[in-house]
Amino acid sequence: MRAFVGTVPFTIIEAVHFVIANNYDDADLYMVKVFDGAEDVCERVRQTGVFKNVYLVEDVLLTYPITIEKCIRTVKNGKAFLKSTRNRIYDEVYYNNSGWLINSIFYTAFSRANKNIKNKFLEHGFNSYTTVYSDKPFYLRVLIRLVGLKCMDGTMLDEIHMFHPELMHMKHYGRIVKMTPMDRKNTRLVEALNHIFNYHPETDEFADRDIIIMEQGPQKFTFDKEGFWKKVLKNIDKQKTIIKPHPRQKNSTLGENGIKISTNYTLPWEVEILNIDIEKKTQITIFSGACV
């Protein structure tokens, strides 16, 4: 049996793609509630039949800005998850997050039942190519151990699956494995993702827009985002533009600029481009790797 961890929509896409590409019939998905509509998405994942079991997990993803309240909630939910998975045994577990805390929660849960479990990473965008996962503040390891978790610091990784392994030059643990590219001609993949994220070609909000603004989710550093977008919005045709909020946003931060805002917050851009031709469209973003 294999376990996959899904948080933001892109990680769910990766898990679905990986299972279909490898024809697995023994995979479970653990989907963490980190975005609006997660419950509905989880149910639609079940309906596709891609996974043997799909479990909805209370939020254990610590996001910025980090607060004491968030830390307490994450640890509390993590403890409940450990209790609920006590009798589940897996041979392999696939992670696709850069956070030590969330990965340590799943690592602790699954490694206690099988000490020889294979730990594997699926890349999570450009961050996998530019950041050393094992490079974290020393106190984080201490805190994770203090709350009774085994620290998933990367040293126990067996494999890292990447779409472009030739671009990986960062320090890492585990063998690098090339992932099968996503293919819009793969009918099963496209139909599954369209259903999961409630995509319907006849109601596509981006088809008649030439400019797509991709908003960014919460970051651990500050920058003049308002000033950046103010300059951009002065130089574009607003009637030909649409804003795509980040899946973790509750509301768009650009909502009062007279520009149409996409209503399907949870629709990942990767699903959109599997269905339409974006060659002649202009994408504007600050950090979003989906544009690449």
Residue spans of the language-model regions?
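Donor nucleotide-activated moiety binding/catalytic core segment of transferases
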Residues: 247-292
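A nucleotide-sugar donor-handling region in carbohydrate enzymes
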Residues: 124, 129-209
